[in-house]
Amino acid sequence: MSFTPGKQSSSRASSGNRSGNGILKWADQSDQSRNVQTRGRRAQPKQTATSQQPSAGNVVPYYSWFSGITQFQKGKEFEFAEGQGVPIAPGVPATEAKGYWYRHNRRSFKTADGNQRQLLPRWYFYYLGTGPHAKDQYGTDIDGVFWVASNQADVNTPADILDRDPSSDEAIPTRFPPGTVLPQGYYIEGSGRSAPNSRSTSRTSSRASSAGSRSRANSGNRTPTSGVTPDMADQIASLVLAKLGKDATKPQQVTKQTAKEIRQKILNKPRQKRSPNKQCTVQQCFGKRGPNQNFGGGEMLKLGTSDPQFPILAELAPTAGAFFFGSRLELAKVQNLSGNLDEPQKDVYELRYNGAIRFDSTLSGFETIMKVLNENLNAYQQQDGMMNMSPKPQRQRGQKNGQGENDNISVAAPKSRVQQNKSRELTAEDISLLKKMDEPFTEDTSEI
């Protein structure tokens, strides 16, 4: 009994497609299938991008049951842990979950500046005993092939899986069992996300793959009649970046000039449309913190919406509908304090609102939200208190503690030698005075 991915098990027996008679191929590969090597293998295209014309990648002459995984970061290895890496396919038991990922080196194209750019490769999964390496044993060291199998599968026998007929079977969006660790620097085609999200259910890739497959099967050549290729989106993006003089692989550096331009661009917006960030702080956008603007403190005032804690607070922000229909609104005309006296004065209005955001402890991330709110609500009061406290006098280098304290306390004129109680040697005059003090006192009765 053969199994068909995406369908229930059927009694259809395998028609011997693995021998090469029934496998669908690209039109330009029809002659290669007739050539047989001495070891009985079908002639396979080389897996290097330089094996054909500079603008073409290696050919994938077999249809995979699943959408591909595309590399978007250079230098990242394509690998899975042992027992992982086989996509989920309804109708295929775990004993048949074995096969390999095949690297498809895509074509290169010429950029606007005349240079050739090689697109990063894309990987496709084939069950053991099918695809471009149907004759190879599991675990054979082959460049551009990564073998995967579940723990329940017997890798010594081919998988009993039918080959995909693109005219009747669409490609299945690639998904993996929970707990699968996916290679970094790759994304699953059709999911719009990087490979770490293995639960995508998008069918965009399957429709695109099926449409392209039918076009190739009906037209008899590799060039679709519409002129649209799978790599056209990448080519267009690269051409646009080259035209603008930008490189998508290099991070954009923010200089003082660009930071000033960003800040001015934000400040030119209406007050209710501003989003503070590193280049334009909260105080620059909305002024100092106080009783009427009492949220924000510490790093959040410096980083604004760039603060790592801000996204979880943004989940509490009301929608436009909740703002208008769930708040108390009041329209008031205010004095226009902007502009010169020579300029015509404009009527300025304020739409004042009063509302509330209600949530409970069942909200996801409740503890973190409460922590962030407690740290930032009325934080200006704590900062003002710290500013009002007299700072502790700092001791200068090389100065003793006692000396510093005496200098800070003594602000009057210097003391005399007697007040300072400093010891010194007695002079002859001092000794004479002391003797007179010891003599008995006699009253002078002489008349003046």
From Swiss-Prot:
Residues 52-194 are annotated as: RNA-binding. Keywords: ADP-ribosylation, Host Golgi apparatus, Phosphoprotein, Ribonucleoprotein, RNA-binding, Transcription, Transcription regulation, Viral nucleoprotein, Virion. The modification Phosphoserine is found at residues 167, 191, 390, 423. Residues 422-439 have a biased composition (Basic and acidic residues). Residues 266-384 are annotated as: Dimerization. GO terms for molecular function: RNA binding. Residues 1-55, 157-231, 266-298, 385-448 are annotated as: Disordered. ADP-ribosylated. The ADP-ribosylation is retained in the virion during infection. Residues 61-190 form the CoV N NTD domain. Residues 259-384 form the CoV N CTD domain. It is found in: Virion; Host endoplasmic reticulum-Golgi intermediate compartment; Host Golgi apparatus. RNA binds at residues 106, 122, 164. One of its GO terms (cellular component) is host cell endoplasmic reticulum-Golgi intermediate compartment. InterPro entries: N_prot_C_CoV, N_prot_N_CoV, NCAP_bCoV, Nucleocap_CoV, Nucleocapsid_C, Nucleocapsid_N. Residues 9-22, 193-223 have a biased composition (Low complexity). Residues 266-276 have a biased composition (Basic residues). Disulfide bonds: none annotated. The modification Phosphothreonine is found at residues 174, 427. Residues 29-38, 45-55, 399-409 have a biased composition (Polar residues). HAMAP family: BETA_CORONA_NCAP. Homooligomer. Both monomeric and oligomeric forms interact with RNA. Interacts with protein M. Interacts with NSP3; this interaction serves to tether the genome to the newly translated replicase-transcriptase complex at a very early stage of infection. Belongs to the betacoronavirus nucleocapsid protein family. Packages the positive strand viral genome RNA into a helical ribonucleocapsid (RNP) and plays a fundamental role during virion assembly through its interactions with the viral genome and membrane protein M. Plays an important role in enhancing the efficiency of subgenomic viral RNA transcription as well as viral replication. This is Nucleoprotein. It comes from Bovine coronavirus (strain LSU-94LSS-051). The gene is N.
